[in-house]
From Swiss-Prot:
The chain crosses the membrane at residues 727-747. Residues 761-783, 862-904 are annotated as: Disordered. This is Envelope glycoprotein. It comes from Bovine immunodeficiency virus (strain R29). Residues 1-726 are extracellular. Changing residue 255 to S: In strain: Isolate R29-106. The mature envelope protein (Env) consists of a trimer of SU-TM heterodimers attached by non-covalent interactions or by a labile interchain disulfide bond. The sequence shown is that of isolate R29-127.
Length: 904
């Protein structure tokens, strides 16, 4: 008692944990194990926690080389958070009774990582929708060439850690490690750091560690391909948060190991940030309005055009209807415009994005084309100037007519962008922009824009925004936009970044200039190009791809481990069940073995069914890939057959002006024929695509899919039915239990007949009286068969309850002492044990059932006339009194019996 008071006084004086423990050890008040336990109870990190963190690091390195499923990541995060929460809470409640909880959760974390390493051999991408393509990248493809080698190494490593931990926990001063040396190392490795030094170290070192992790991933990206840094970071962060909340309330100090953990978290976050290719654009995603990010350089956006001009690459049949359009909040639009005002080109849709359309149209209007190298100030369309050897390489086209008037002058032009770019703007053409109009949308295809508007109409549009010298101003009405690589030539030439058009009419370029400017000004007045982050959005791709882009990894390792686990379970269950059922009834033992064999047969059947379905899936995917290649080849053959050269996902008619039928006038009939042929190609490609998709869906609609793993199937073996069916089963069991209770109550009433029968008046119709010495009166041994049956039922129920109580107490003791080597087989054989008890109880009930022994009327023992006594009839005691002969307590028994005998 005095020692406790002294320890309390020393604790009140504010001595550190290290000093107090060292003093206790030196004075011999604590053994080495007690000192370690005291250190743990004081809130320091448990060795098992360090082992768990080490195993988590193994999982992170495991994720570097192979791909971890999302479900496993959430399981790890949940387990670690739950462990820390229970561990820290239990220290406040009871320091001794919860020690096994921490050990259990550490084992669970290690076991989960072991399962993860095995599951990686069977991990695969989920089946994709045919029109959604998973584009493989260098930083997402798994680099695990021989997964089974990595799995064996990880299993051996984890088993080694478990062995070391078990040795350390069972060691004392005479064993492998000296306990005092262990304590000294533990104390020296956990020197306390005052908060005034700990917080600056964390605030300065954590960003540095994150930066180091970032550059480590940048320099060694091929090594750290797809790590589980997010798993380790989040789980450690939440676990430390739960622990540090309690530590902050208790005003405890930080130690070296805790600071190292936080630095590890920062390092992991830096590695993860680099893995997702974080850069200035990701920072812009965070600072920009939710869901959208301003695009500063619109010339880099992948544009595709719609036009009424007959250009194959701009045909509307390639796109069909707009596949994305939604209304957006006015507040968001206002924020987008405010962000756009800070960029000179955010709202300027570049005219040179028309280059592809102009090039296609110019090819149809050109007599000649050649490559030239020119510099600014050179008019290549004039015969007086010639090309030079230096300058900008461009394509020069000599046109027959005016491109603008022929193809664009009386048409409208519509532009679409490829995901993840979208256009934010208005549907209407109001001159004044109002953020409260309610017409703001985000779409992939802008509405058609008329290109022949006059200058007066264009002047009514909202001016383009730019941010120059801190003030909002307008750009000049130049063709090429702000700060683009456009070259100026003579009066007869018009140029874009890589194209020179030479027209016969000197004013032709002015016409094209006005039309291009018309489109640019109208589009820029109503639309802003933004980029949508890929978080939560579905990527719509250009081409159709098969559901699986990668060859299925071998499942031999996972299947072998799965069968090995089942074999161990079966052997353990058989041995434990055999030893448990030695003292059971022979019939029950036979029935249980039959049931057990049937269950094993069913499990084996499920395994082979699952294996055959996986083989079927492989055949389906192989057929799917072959059919896709046939589909692509058939499309190309059709394109070549119609004279349209394949170019990406489009094809081009490479016909010269003479083939089209041009001399000096437009031959609409010839061009219409070419358009009809192109439409035939589109229809044929669409039909091939539909047939291919239908065949692909029909091949895989009755299969499980390749994403189902062996361990998911192991879980499904125990997932018998849904929760609704379980509710129905529980209700049926309750109803049956009530019916059984009612039936037993009726049988108990029948059992009382013998006593009532013995106390009836001894009167006969013929005047003969029954001797009072009749053995049938007052002899409890001559009770009814129902009473004997009820006694047997009670004995069987008591025996079953006693056996179950012993089994339950045994399980509880094993669970409390963490004897997993004995608890696991006990739990595995528990269903068979319950089945045996049930069968034995039913056997005892039906073996002594009266229906099996009652063969007719029971011959009475009393009476001199030798008459047979009637069988026992139930006596209803209306008052519940045990005095059966009391005429005031119910019916007149004598009158009832006399009437009954008179009726005979």
């Amino acid at each position: 008692m005095d020692q406790d008071l002294d320890g309390a006084e020393r604790g009140e004086r504010g001595g550190g944990s290290e000093e107090l423990l060292q003093e206790e050890i030196n004075e011999g008040r604590l053994t080495a194990r007690e000192a370690l336990q005291t250190w743990i109870n004081n809130g320091e990190i448990h060795p098992w926690v360090l082992a768990g963190m080490l195993s988590m690091g193994v999982g992170m390195l495991l994720g570097v080389y192979c791909q971890l499923p999302d479900t496993l990541i959430w399981i790890l995060m949940f387990q670690l958070c739950l462990y820390w929460g229970l561990g820290e809470t239990s220290r406040e409640l009871d320091k001794d009774s919860w020690q096994w909880v921490r050990s259990v959760f550490i084992i669970a974390i290690l076991g989960t990582l072991t399962m993860a390493g095995t599951a990686l051999a069977d991990d695969d991408q989920s089946t994709l929708i045919p029109n959604i393509t998973k584009i493989p990248t260098k930083d997402t493809e798994p680099g695990c060439t021989y997964p089974w080698i990595l799995i064996l190494l990880i299993l051996a490593f984890i088993l080694g850690i478990l062995g070391i931990i078990l040795v350390l926990r069972r060691s004392n001063s005479e064993d492998i490690l000296a306990a005092r040396d262990t304590i000294d190392w533990w104390l020296s490795a956990n020197q306390e750091i005052p908060p005034k030094f700990a917080f600056p170290i964390i605030l300065i070192s954590s960003p540095l560690a994150g930066i180091i992790g970032y550059y480590v991933m940048e320099r060694h990206l091929e090594i750290f391909k797809k790590g589980c840094q997010i798993c380790g970071s989040l789980s450690s962060m939440w676990g430390m948060l739960l622990e540090e909340i309690g530590r902050w309330l208790a005003r405890r100090e930080w130690n070296v190991s805790r600071v190292m953990v936080i630095l590890l978290i920062s390092f992991s976050w830096g590695m993860y940030v680099n893995r997702v290719n974080a850069s200035g654009s990701h920072v812009a995603m965070v600072t920009s309005p939710p869901g959208y990010r301003i695009v500063n350089d619109t010339s880099q956006a992948p544009w595709y055009c719609f036009s009424s001009a007959p250009i194959p690459t701009c045909s509307s049949s390639q796109w069909g209807d707009k596949y994305f359009e939604e209304k957006i909040n006015e507040t968001l639009v206002k924020q987008v415009y405010e962000q756009a005002a800070k960029h000179s080109r955010a709202t300027w849709i570049e005219p040179d994005l028309l280059e592809e359309a102009v090039y296609e149209l110019a090819l149809l209007s050109a007599n000649d084309s050649r490559q030239v190298v020119v510099e600014n100030g050179t008019d290549v369309c004039s015969s007086q100037n010639s090309s030079t050897n230096k300058g900008h390489p461009m394509t020069l086209l000599k046109l027959r007519g005016q491109v603008s008037e022929t193809w664009i002058g009386n048409s409208s032009l519509q532009f679409c962008v490829q995901w993840p770019y979208v256009l934010v703007g208005l549907n209407n053409s109001d001159s004044n922009i109002s953020f409260n109009s309610g017409d703001w949308i985000a779409t992939n295809c802008m509405h058609p824009i008329t290109l022949n508007k006059s200058a007066q109409d264009l002047g009514k549009n909202f001016p383009r925004l730019t941010f120059l010298d801190g003030q909002l101003s307008q750009l000049k009405n130049t063709l090429c936009g702000h700060n683009t690589n456009c070259l100026k030539f003579g009066n007869k030439s018009f140029s874009t970044n890589s194209l020179i058009l030479c027209q016969d009419n000197p004013i032709g370029n002015d016409t094209f200039y006005s039309l291009s400017h018309s489109f640019s000004k109208q589009a820029s007045a109503r639309w802003i190009l933004v980029k949508v982050p890929s978080y939560g959005f579905v990527v719509v791709n250009d081409t159709d791809t098969p559901p699986s882009l990668r060859i299925r990894k071998p499942r031999a390792v996972g299947l072998a481990i799965f069968l090995l686990v089942l074999a161990i379970m079966a052997i353990t269950s058989s041995l434990v069940a055999a030893t448990t059922l030695v003292n059971q009834h022979t019939t029950a033992k036979v029935v249980e073995r039959v049931v057990q064999n049937v269950s094993y047969i069913a499990q084996t059947q499920d395994q082979f069914t699952h294996l055959f379905r996986n083989i079927n899936n492989r055949l389906n995917v192989l057929h799917h890939r072959v059919s896709y290649l046939e589909y692509v080849e058939e499309i190309r053959q059709k394109q070549v057959f119609f004279g349209c050269k394949p170019h990406g996902r489009y094809c081009h008619f490479d016909f010269g002006p003479e083939e089209v039928g041009w001399n000096n006038s437009w031959n609409s009939k010839t061009w219409n024929d070419l358009q009809d042929e192109y439409d035939k190609i589109e229809e044929k490609i669409l039909k091939i695509r539909v047939d291919w998709l239908n065949s692909s869906l029909s091949d895989t609609q009755d299969t499980f899919g390749l994403e189902t793993s062996i361990f998911d199937h192991l879980v499904q073996l125990f997932d018998w039915t849904s929760w609704k069916d379980w509710i129905k089963i529980i209700i049926v069991i309750i109803v049956l239990w009530l019916l059984i209770k009612i039936l037993l109550g009726m049988l108990r009433s029948c059992a009382k007949v013998s006593q009532n029968y013995q106390h009836l008046p001894a009167e006969e119709e013929d005047g003969d009286t029954e001797p009072e010495s009749s053995p049938a009166r007052g002899d409890p041994a001559s009770g009814s068969l129902y009473e004997n049956w009820l006694n047997k039922i009670g004995e069987s129920k008591n025996d079953a309850y006693r056996v179950w109580t012993e089994e339950y107490n045994s399980l509880r003791i094993l669970f409390a002492t963490c004897r997993w080597d004995l608890l696991t087989p006990q739990l595995l054989q528990l269903p068979f044990f319950l089945l045996t008890l049930l069968l034995k109880l039913l056997w005892d009930i039906f073996r002594h059932a009266p229906i099996l022994n009652l063969k007719g009327w029971t011959v009475g023992q009393g009476g001199t006339s030798g008459q047979q006594q009637p069988p026992d009839f139930p006596y209803v005691n209306w008052t519940g009194s045990r005095e059966q002969n009391n005429p005031e307590g119910g019916l007149d028994s004598g009158a009832w019996y006399e009437g009954l005998r008179g009726s005979q």
